[in-house]
Structure formats: structure tokens, C-alpha cells
């Protein structure tokens, strides 16, 4: 199919392009930016006056819940939610059932994605077998199958020697290791950030040091091994400072933050609403401000949804007995637009943190607009608004933003030149 997108404000953060112009797509590729190629004839024209055309968003943390947790979601439903939020490429974590630690599971996910996915799916493989922190998974074979990085989720590898050897092995093959830095002992049993709010509510706390202690250890071992490292779900201002110091030393380190950590604080749990039960926990306004500053400066180069859909019953128990997580990929772009609305970021910088930044962090082939490249795009109206939940594709409705009026509205999402979201 050939498509012409006319009169859009085309923003490509990777190249610095920001101008009102046209895009022409042919055979799933970008044929031209600006004037149409000689002999080009569009079978479909999208009039895009007042609309921004940008690289499709790249989300580094989307739990697809398949295999093993179909009551919470599946590849079809959660990638449908992803394209509704402007996401064309996503990474799914290894916490499936069975764990994504073998070729069979990786191939199952990728085969299912080819069959049912609306967006492109890039698995993150398990660093250790069963995420148990003892034996390395088949990292090279998993890479060759299609895994873009490797991690152990929130399950810490307790033995320093085991982790050091794992990082050295990964460095040998130029693999990227994803860390979720939370010390198991300091976080054990915790439900909320350890501070005034947790004390007031009588909830067991998870101190900032649960992140910073684990982060410091991991950074030292990264320095020793030279491995490419990505630190996911940074939650504290001090954690962001440690990342900045590592980058100043020249370590090959990148980081992301969950979008909701840039919006919410531990004050949100005041009413014991399980919709705000997340792991790692929401932290203080000071931490939120520190994270925002790190995003603005580029120390944190990626904003992700860290989408975790749940069935209704998973959030109906008392706070401490509920499952943590927020279903949020469907709102990634409009929620992120609140950062522009608040004056924290300009639009090109926001789009960099949502596309080229995350793509570079995990070397995902996405996040840019170039002639001959894949026609993965999001078209959105920055002046319109989205009422969260009016239309909902994810199986998980565990989202505290449902009912909120958010800035910006996704009009079209295209993957390989095919309209996956928007008017057919």
C-alpha cells in the first residue's frame, strides 16, 4: 500500500527534524520526506494539518502476560493497547510462565507475535535459569533467536560472584543486561515507600536504600566487567544521581523510568487504593522532582510504561494482599504529554525519551524516520484531549488514570506502513 501523509508537523528527535512537511510511504517503508518521489501514486491520503507525525514510540517494559497468565492479558490484547498509545515497538520482560529462559519459550512468544501482535515485539530473555540467580540461561542462543537484552526482573541475584561472572560472560558477547535494582533484604515485605506516609498508614516500608544499595553494587560490577547495562525503573532522586555519576565516569550505562513515577508520589496511597500498589513503590515528591530533572537532562534517556495488566480480582483485596502494577501502555502518549503541559519538556525532547532514547538503550531497530526505513509512525493531535478509559483495549483495567482528561490524542499508529490504530 502507498500512503501520503500531508501537512503534518514531522518531528524526528534522532535527526533533529522538526518541520511541517509530507511523508510518503510505500511497501511498509518511508519512500520520501517532503516531495513525493517521481511516479509515486498514493492509494491513500491522510490529511494531517495540525497533527504531529513522529517515530512510533518504543516501550521497554510491557508485560504481555503470554505465556502463562492469559487471565491478565495476551499478546493480541496488550499489543492492541500498545498501538492505541502510539507504541510500535515494545520489549516484554522474562517473567512469563514458563520463564523466558529457553529457545522454546522465546520462539513461542515470537511465533505468537508474528501471528497476533499489532506492534513489534522484542523479548528480554532471562539472565539466569528460572530467574533463580544460580545458573546462566542460554544467553547467546536466546540472542540469536531474537532476545534484545537479558535481565532477572526484580529477582535479585544474591551471590556477587555469580552476578560478576554473568556480567563478564555477557560482556564477552556484547550483550545488554537489564537491571531492576532493588535489594531483596531491604525490600522484603515492603508495600510502600518507607517514609511519613507509610508510617501514617501502618504499611511496611521499602526504603530508598533498597534501590541505592543494589544500584551501587550493580554499577561497581558493571565497571569491573565493562558490560552494556540498562537500569530499569529508577524510582529515587539518589538513584538517578548514581546513574549520572556512572555516566560521567564513562560507563556504558543507560536508564529508564516508569512514566507513572514522573506523575505520582507516595501521597497517592493515602486512601489505600490498590491501583497505586506498584513495585518498586511510588516515592516522595522530592524523588519525583529528581527523576524529572534526570529525564530533562538526558541522564534517564527513556520513559517507559512498565505496563502490568491484571484481572479485576487481583486488585480487589486489601492493599497488601493485592498484586502490584498499573495497566498504562494504552495511555503512554497522552500521559507523557502532561510533562509538556507542565512545562518540564518540550515536545521534541519528550519524543526523544519515548522513541530514539529507548531504542538506542536496548539497540531496538526503531525510533527514527529515515528514507528507506520502516514506516513505524504515530500521528497525534497535541491540541486534542483523551478521556482515559472511554476506549480500552487492554484486558487490565487496573489504571488509576481512568476517567482523567489527558492532553493529546493518538489519531493513527502505523506499523510497517499498515494502519494498526485509527480510521481504516
From Swiss-Prot:
The keyword Magnesium does not apply. It comes from the Bacteria. InterPro entries: Amidohydro-rel, DHOase, DHOase/Allantoinase_Hydrolase, Metal-dep_hydrolase_composite, Metal_Hydrolase. GO terms for biological process: purine nucleobase catabolic process; pyrimidine nucleotide biosynthetic process. Heterododecamer of 6 active PyrB subunits and 6 non-catalytic PyrC' subunits. It comes from Pseudomonas putida (Arthrobacter siderocapsulatus). Keywords: Pyrimidine biosynthesis. The keyword Nucleotidyltransferase does not apply. Non-functional DHOase. One of its GO terms (molecular function) is metal ion binding. SUPFAM superfamilies: Composite domain of metallo-dependent hydrolases, Metallo-dependent hydrolases. This is Dihydroorotase-like protein.
Amino acid at each position: 500500500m502507498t500512503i501520503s501523509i500531508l501537512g503534518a508537523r514531522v518531528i524526528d528527535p534522532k535527526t533533529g527534524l522538526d518541520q511541517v512537511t509530507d511523508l510518503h510511504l510505500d511497501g511498509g517503508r518511508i519512500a520520501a520526506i517532503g516531495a513525493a518521489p517521481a511516479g509515486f501514486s498514493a492509494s491513500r491520503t491522510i490529511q494531517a494539518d495540525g497533527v504531529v507525525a513522529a517515530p512510533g514510540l518504543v516501550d521497554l517494559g510491557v508485560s504481555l502476560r503470554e505465556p502463562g497468565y492469559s487471565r491478565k492479558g495476551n499478546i493480541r490484547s496488550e499489543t492492541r493497547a500498545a498501538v492505541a498509545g502510539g507504541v510500535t515497538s515494545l520489549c516484554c520482560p522474562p517473567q512469563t510462565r514458563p520463564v523466558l529462559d529457553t529457545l522454546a519459550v522465546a520462539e513461542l512468544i515470537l511465533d505468537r507475535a508474528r501471528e497476533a501482535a499489532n506492534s513489534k515485539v522484542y523479548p528480554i530473555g532471562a539472565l539466569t535459569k528460572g530467574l533463580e540467580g544460580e545458573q546462566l540461561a542460554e544467553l547467546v542462543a536466546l540472542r540469536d533467536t531474537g532476545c534484545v537484552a537479558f535481565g532477572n526482573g526484580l529477582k535479585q541475584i544474591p551471590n556477587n560472584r555469580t552476578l560478576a561472572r554473568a556480567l563478564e560472560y555477557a560482556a564477552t558477547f556484547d550483550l545488554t543486561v537489564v537491571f531492576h535494582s532493588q535489594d531483596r533484604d531491604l525490600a522484603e515485605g515492603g508495600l510502600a515507600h518507607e517514609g511519613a506516609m507509610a508510617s501514617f498508614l501502618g504499611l511496611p516500608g521499602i526504603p530508598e536504600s533498597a534501590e541505592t544499595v543494589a544500584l551501587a553494587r550493580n554499577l561497581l560490577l558493571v565497571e569491573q566487567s565493562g558490560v552494556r547495562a540498562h537500569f530499569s525503573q529508577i524510582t529515587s532522586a539518589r538513584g538517578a544521581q548514581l546513574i549520572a555519576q556512572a555516566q560521567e565516569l564513562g560507563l556504558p550505562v543507560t536508564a529508564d523510568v516508569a512514566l507513572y513515577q514522573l506523575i505520582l508520589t507516595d501521597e497517592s496511597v493515602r486512601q489505600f487504593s490498590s491501583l497505586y500498589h506498584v513495585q518498586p513503590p511510588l516515592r516522595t515528591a522530592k524523588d519525583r522532582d529528581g527523576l524529572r530533572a534526570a529525564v530533562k537532562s538526558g541522564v534517564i534517556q527513556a520513559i517507559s510504561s512498565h505496563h502490568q495488566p491484571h484481572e479485576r480480582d487481583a486488585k480487589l483485596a486489601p492493599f497488601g494482599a493485592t498484586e502490584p502494577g498499573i495497566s498504562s501502555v494504552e495511555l503512554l502518549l497522552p500521559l507523557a504529554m502532561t510533562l509538556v503541559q507542565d512545562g518540564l519538556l518540550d515536545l521534541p525532547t519528550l519524543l526523544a525519551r519515548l522513541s530514539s532514547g529507548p531504542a538506542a538503550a536496548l539497540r531496538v531497530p526503531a525510533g527514527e524516520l529515515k528514507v528507506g526505513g520502516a514506516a513505524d509512525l504515530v500521528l497525534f493531535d497535541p491540541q486534542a484531549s483523551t478521556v482515559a478509559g472511554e476506549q480500552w483495549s487492554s484486558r487490565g483495567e487496573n489504571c488509576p488514570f481512568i476517567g482523567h482528561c489527558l492532553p493529546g490524542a493518538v489519531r493513527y499508529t502505523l506499523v510497517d506502513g499498515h494502519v494498526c490504530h485509527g480510521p481504516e
